[in-house]
A protein has these predicted regions:
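Glycine-centered tight-turn and secondary-structure capping sites
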Residues: 46-50
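RNA-contacting regions in translation and RNA-metabolism proteins
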Residues: 1-42, 55-76
Length: 76
């Protein structure tokens, strides 16, 4: 899951070296993926009306469902 979000984020932003992705297990069935990008790239990650962020959350949810865990994406 972490690798997927990192790949997508680095493909979108102008400063790919500033992308940081961490994964935390809240409990047995919940994973929180935290995405940190440069301030200049936050607009690109969120997208117009949040479409890019929502698409990333949807992909993360699909992968999580396959693995049997609930997921959450936090953009910092």
């Amino acid at each position: 899951m972490k690798d997927l979000i990192e790949y997508i984020a680095k493909s979108i932003v102008t400063l790919p070296d500033e992308v940081r992705v961490t994964e935390e297990a809240d409990d047995k069935s919940r994973v929180i993926v935290k995405l940190e990008v440069a301030a200049a790239d936050k607009g690109r990650i969120i997208g117009r009306q949040g479409r890019v962020a929502e698409a990333m959350r949807t992909l993360l949810r699909v992968v999580g469902t396959k693995e049997g865990v609930r997921t959450r994406l936090e953009i910092l």
